[in-house]
Amino acid sequence: MMKKIDVKILDARVGTDFPLPTYATSGSAGLDLRACLNEATVLQPGATTLLPTGLAIHIADPQLAAVILPRSGLGHKHGVVLGNLVGLIDSDYQGPLMVSVWNRGQDSFTIEPGERIAQMVFVPVVQAEFNLVNDFDASVRGEGGFGHSGRQ
């Protein structure tokens, strides 16, 4: 299913010096977001910073949201992950897309202008209404929680 989302370019380099977000393959779920920087930024171990993407979006459809997720290679190879672990973009948000990055590694990491720093995935939204009850209908699982089914 293809859905049109309004995107506003906040930095003139997006679409020229830095590519617009695109899906890398026909099976890709995420669009890569890039650091829209004027110069390289060094992220020291333990430090966090907010990086601009040069974009603003307005999803507009209350049945959709976007999540900002880390890129697997940055976290696994360099220890650079999202500062808030996952970013949530609500359908009515219209401001700039910023990415919080955290260097949880032992070494400093340099982020170059235009570097891919995160990925954005659009997800369906179901707004729930709570129904207050005194008890639940019994299920096989019941109240079994963390690790209740064993390791093997």
Swiss-Prot record:
Substrates-to-products reaction catalysed: dUTP + H2O = dUMP + diphosphate + H(+)
Top-rank EC class of the record's enzyme: hydrolase
EC number: 3.6.1.23
UniProt pathway: Pyrimidine metabolism; dUMP biosynthesis; dUMP from dCTP (dUTP route): step 2/2
Ribonucleoprotein as UniProt keyword: no
Cofactor or coenzyme needed: Mg(2+)
Pfam families: dUTPase
UniProt GO BP: dUMP biosynthetic process; dUTP catabolic process
Function statement: This enzyme is involved in nucleotide metabolism: it produces dUMP, the immediate precursor of thymidine nucleotides and it decreases the intracellular concentration of dUTP so that uracil cannot be incorporated into DNA.
Family under the similarity heading: Belongs to the dUTPase family.
Descriptive protein name: Deoxyuridine 5'-triphosphate nucleotidohydrolase
Lineage, highest ranks first: Bacteria, Pseudomonadati, Pseudomonadota, Gammaproteobacteria, Enterobacterales
